Every structure is written in structure tokens, then in C-alpha cells.
Amino acid sequence: MAFQLTPLRVALVAGEPSGDLLGASLLGGLHARLPASSRYYGIGGPRMSAVEFDAHWPMEKLAVRGYVEALKHIPEILRIRGELKRQLLAEPPDAFVGIDAPDFNFGLEPALRGAGIPTIHFVCPSIWAWRGGRIKKIVKAVDHMLCLFPFEPELLEKAGVAATFVGHPLADEIPLEPDTHGARIALGLPGGGPVIAVLPGSRRSEIELIGPTFFDAMELMQQREPGVRFVVPAATPALRALLQPLVDAHPSLSVTLTEGRAQVAMTAADAILVKSGTVTLEAALLKKPMVISYKVPWLTGQIMRRQGYLPYVGLPNILAGRFVVPELLQHFATPDALADATLTQLRDDANRRALTDIFTDMHLALRQNTAQRAAEAVARVIDSRKPR
């Protein structure tokens, strides 16, 4: 390609942990594909920073969840976006890659695109799940979309947006057959009764909303299934400190609280109770029966209900096109209902076998060597803009 020996400058913006994972995967592919002296900079997290990325701002500045909750952070977020836009327009990069974070990136990308900077967006917003005019924003903002799921490019191309299916890096990372026994040994849980992993979220606000309900459900499950053991992974030391009082308030529970080992905890489990999010896809790739739940503040929930039109929110159900695992959301997420549904997932062997087949097919469809495919797509976009 024309730029084979020419150093490049690629700006990237990721706004939350899932975007940091995707960004790190993409950076790995770009380091292999583009000249060694190329520079990568913008907004990202620790995974991106670990692969030679210069984070001008930490992604935590953007990681705010919920419509109402974001209001108090809007001034700072707008200030950061304005400053980044000025920097990029003053010294245009060879390409800009917005990694998810559509509210932030779709407000930035049109100006960059208008200035002739190639704009690539990694992770198609859920245009297939939500009402409204997101597709119009995409048309204005994006030169090329990198899609995680195979049905997305066709939807985008109908609207005139170039798109490439690149798969999901988690499908490349996670083995087709999880080592449950090895994970239990790693967590100090080699013998004994069944194990349920409980994941109440990766943000303080999520844990504060649904954590007490999950722990009450765990209490009921232990009463109904004596010998059951629980493992609860905390994403950070701060979240572990937030979860510890819940553990202390339920002294009869057989629970292991871990830090930063969510995938190991899920691998060790026979069933999972999980707050909705990317982690549900991870649970599916690990071939685990699960119950998906969430609670958000009432007003946020009302807005989400009016905007959504798919009957499900969990990625395993969205990818399957039907309910393959139960979802208990908002006021339906009672301790009793969560306990019953999770124990059903634990005990139903026929359902476990069926889910293993469904999730294996899902895994194979998403295993596409994402880092290489995404990097090649970015390289093609850059090359298409270079003088011949």
C-alpha cells in the first residue's frame, strides 16, 4: 500500500472498559499492520495504554452510564470533546477511530469528517434494537463502520454506510471449551457443591442499585440449594470495597469475593446471575447458563423502555434472535424471582446442553481474528485517501 514505509498518526477514542478491550485488540492489529513508527493517541483506558497508546485523557472521564446520571457530567465531557476536536483539526491525523461511546464520538466525528479526516467507528450502535434516528447520525459521522456482529453490515450498507464485519475479540480470546476445573482451582474452589457466579456490574451506580437485590437472591438460593457456593468478581479495588459490606451483611453465605478476575469466576461457574452488558456475551462464549438482569433509576428506565423495540436486552438473546436465557429487569428483578430463575438454570441439564450448542455456534460465528480484520479495514480506509 502507498503508506507502507510512511509513519502514520491515528487518533482513537474509547469511553468505557468494553471499548478499552476493543481498542487494545485493534491497536495490536495496527502495530502489526502499519509502520512501526506510527503514533496512536487520544482517549483510552489501561489496556490501550499498555500497547503503546498515548492517552491524553483517561476514559473514566467519559464512562458515565444512564441518561439522567450523565447530566451532571455534561459540562466536563463537552469541554474534553471541544478540546480534542480543536487538537485534531489543528493537527489532522491520518485517521480517527471512535470506539463505541456513540454519544461522545458522534458529536465529534462529523467535524473531523468535514475537514477531510477519515472517520472510522468501531462498534455499530444498536440501530437494530432502538427506535430513533441513530442511522442518520451514523450517515453524517462515519466513513466506515467496523461491526462486531454479522447481521450489521447489511443494515448499514442499505443506508449508504460502508461497513466491515470483523467479529468480536472475546471470541478470539476465549477457548471453545472452557476449563471449569482449572478455574475453580485458581479460585480455591476445587471441590464441594455447585458454583454460581454473581456479577452485579462494573460501576458504582450499578452495584448500588442492584447489588443488594442480588445478595438477597443469593441468600434465598443457598436456602433452596444447600451446598451452593458463590463467587463475586469486583472489577477494581474500589468496587471490592463497595461489595464487602454486602458480603458482611450476609454472613451465612458461602461466597468468594475476587478482584479483577471476572472471566475466571464465570469459567468456574455452573450458572451465572449477571447484570446486562457486554459481560453477558462473555458468559455465552464460556457456554454458561445465565440469568440477565438490571435495575436503573426510574426515569432512565422509562426513557429506555420508550426507545427500545426489541423484546430483549441481553446480547445472547439478541444474537440468537429469541429468548434463550431469561431476563428479569427493573421491578421484575426481585430476590425471589432471581433466585428461582438462576436455580432453574443451574439444575436443568437439558437446557444446559441446548445452550452449549447455541453458544458454540455463536462463538464460531464471532471468531474472526478481529484484531487483524479490523486493522486491515482501517488500513484500507487510510490508503483510499492517500494520493496515488
UniProtKB/Swiss-Prot annotation:
It comes from the Bacteria. Pathway: Bacterial outer membrane biogenesis; LPS lipid A biosynthesis. It catalyses: a lipid X + a UDP-2-N,3-O-bis[(3R)-3-hydroxyacyl]-alpha-D-glucosamine = a lipid A disaccharide + UDP + H(+). GO terms for molecular function: lipid-A-disaccharide synthase activity; phospholipid binding. Its EC number is 2.4.1.182. Pfam families: LpxB. One of its GO terms (cellular component) is membrane. It is an enzyme of class 2 (transferase). Keywords: Glycosyltransferase, Lipid A biosynthesis, Lipid biosynthesis, Lipid metabolism, Transferase. GO terms for biological process: lipid A biosynthetic process. InterPro entries: Glyco_trans_19. Condensation of UDP-2,3-diacylglucosamine and 2,3-diacylglucosamine-1-phosphate to form lipid A disaccharide, a precursor of lipid A, a phosphorylated glycolipid that anchors the lipopolysaccharide to the outer membrane of the cell. Belongs to the LpxB family. NCBIfam families: lpxB. This is Lipid-A-disaccharide synthase.
